[in-house]
Every structure is written in C-alpha cells, then in structure tokens.
C-alpha cells in the first residue's frame, strides 16, 4: 500500500533532509493525496509521522549511546540541534538531556533484572544437568 511504502521510505531516509514531497514522489502519488491517506489511516499528517519517528529514534539513541545531543539531532535529520531539542521537549515533556538521565537509570535497572534472571536460569540449568547425571 501507499502508506506502508511511505513509512518504509521514512524509516530508510529519516536522517536525510526529507520533505513530504519526497515521500509522495517515492510512492508516486500527489502530496495532498498522501496527506489524506495518512490522516485517514494514522490520524496524523506525513510530516507529523516523520517528526514523531525522528524523535522516537532520538529517544532510542539517547538511551543506548554516548553520542552528544548535537550528534543525535543530526543522526535524526535535524540540521540544528536546538530545533531537535525544542521538538523533543514539546513531544516528550522534557529536554533530551533530562530524558537521557532519567531513562539511563531505567535501562540499567532492566539490565540488572535481566542479569539476575539469567543467573537464576543458569543455576536452574546447572541443577537440571546434575539431576540428569
């Protein structure tokens, strides 16, 4: 479908200087028709989808990398990190730096819990092997 092709194009090119007209051209439809399809299907414009996709990717990079906010903004298709920060704060409710700080701790807790679960599984696995001998 046009929407799935458009979304795939966005996923592959979100870091580029991407415009809605580029997406429409890729899927071979008129820009206004692309807007109608997105509004009908996703209840948002293609531009809003692109912005939300970029910010979502930014959240991921803030959490799993040590890259600076400036580098992450550029990796998400923003030429100006201040514009990225402004949009990020508007959508997420906090600055990228604050998001990183708060969510890094959350990730650390999840990793610790996963390691504990793995340790328990390994103990269970060792017991299972001992019982089989």
Positions of PLM-derived features:
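An amphipathic alpha-helical interaction segment
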Residues: 1-8, 33
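Terminal helix-turn-helix DNA-binding modules in bacterial transcription factors
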Residues: 8, 12, 17, 21, ...
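Short hydrophobic/aromatic patch on the recognition helix
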Residues: 33-34, 38, 83-84, 88
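Short coil turns linking two alpha-helices in DNA-binding domains
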Residues: 30-31, 79-80
